[in-house]
Amino acid sequence: MIPATYTLSQITARLGGEWRGEDISVTAVRPLADAQAEHISFLANPKYKAEVHDSSAGAVIVSAKAADGFEGRNLIVADDPYLYFAKVARLFSPVVKARGGIHPTAVVEPGATVPTSCEIGANVYIGANTVLGEGCRILANAVVQHDCKLGDEVVLHPNAVVYYGCTLGRRVEIHSGAVIGADGFGLAFADDSWFKIPQTGAVTLGDDVEIGSNTNIDRGAMSDTTVGNGTKIDNQVQIGHNCKIGSHTVIAAKTGISGSVTIGSYCIIGGGVGTVGHIEIADKTTIGGGTSVTHSITESGKHLAGIFPMSTHKEWARNAVYIHRLSEMNKRLKTLEQQLSDAGQDSK
């Protein structure tokens, strides 16, 4: 494939912003430290300005405030350099469109609807009565069980699995090894053993949802587990049954969301977070990595952190500096207690 090439003026014509210097051609986006003359890079944080001076990048994306320090450099000036970088990167890595056709080793059960615009890879399985939208890409060894509904331009990467009865919105992307709609962990204890509760709900994903590799989203016990439009979930995340996750929320890797948790929209949940079940997390909540969420968060916009117990980020940061000194402080406390005890004995 011939690499895409854009001039700075072509980039700004498509994406906005202002180019300064020579109207050079660039072929890729690279970090400042690695970029060469044919590359474009970016400065998102002004504290790294020195790296721009040391960089061999042909052009750099900067904010208007930072641009004044780089006279003589080829620049694109943008309101948000990081977002602009992401959009430029997309120019060089466009979304792959489906090549219509069904591989001869794929199995499409009777009653399934697969438009001719869809790309169905080797060893794919499409269950009975499942309906695919236009332009879907179901790649090698992926499985879509019966009675599912997929919107237009859904992508299932190799070995992704969608269980029966699930609904995926438009432009959903499921990465390899992810499982959508496996049974939730519902059990009742009786007669010295566990009785499995049938999980009769399903999973519904909104438009533009992305699910990372080896992530599991369990089907609901009676109603659907749901994920709102634009939400992005990282690799190796566990979403329990009956969870309701809002729109445009992001959840980082190794997080576990227990069953029947409701998470609002525009939340940011760091890596390795764990929650108890049956709680609510308000819109625009930020939860730091490794936090144990033990109760509902009812106030929108909170920034929370802490291994245990959960507290505000400010409280956690203030207390965290003492963690590595707890043993020393405990010894000093015992010494002071002993001194006070001895002083009390002497005064008698």
UniProtKB/Swiss-Prot annotation:
GO cellular component: membrane
GO biological-process terms attached to the record: lipid A biosynthetic process
Matches recorded under InterPro entries: Hexapep, Hexapep_transf_CS, LpxD, Trimer_LpxA-like_sf, UDP_GlcNAc_AcTrfase_non-rep
Superkingdom to which the source organism belongs: Bacteria
Reactions that this protein is recorded to catalyse: a UDP-3-O-[(3R)-3-hydroxyacyl]-alpha-D-glucosamine + a (3R)-hydroxyacyl-[ACP] = a UDP-2-N,3-O-bis[(3R)-3-hydroxyacyl]-alpha-D-glucosamine + holo-[ACP] + H(+)
Protein EC: 2.3.1.191
Catalytic center residues: 241 (proton acceptor)
A single GO molecular function term of this UniProt record: N-acyltransferase activity
Signal peptide segment: none
Pathway: Bacterial outer membrane biogenesis; LPS lipid A biosynthesis
Pfam family, one: LpxD
This protein's UniProt keywords: Acyltransferase, Lipid A biosynthesis, Lipid biosynthesis, Lipid metabolism, Repeat, Transferase
Family membership noted in the UniProt record: Belongs to the transferase hexapeptide repeat family. LpxD subfamily.
Complex formation: Homotrimer.
Role summary: Catalyzes the N-acylation of UDP-3-O-acylglucosamine using 3-hydroxyacyl-ACP as the acyl donor. Is involved in the biosynthesis of lipid A, a phosphorylated glycolipid that anchors the lipopolysaccharide to the outer membrane of the cell.
Name of this chain's protein: UDP-3-O-acylglucosamine N-acyltransferase
Organism the protein comes from: Neisseria meningitidis serogroup B (strain ATCC BAA-335 / MC58)
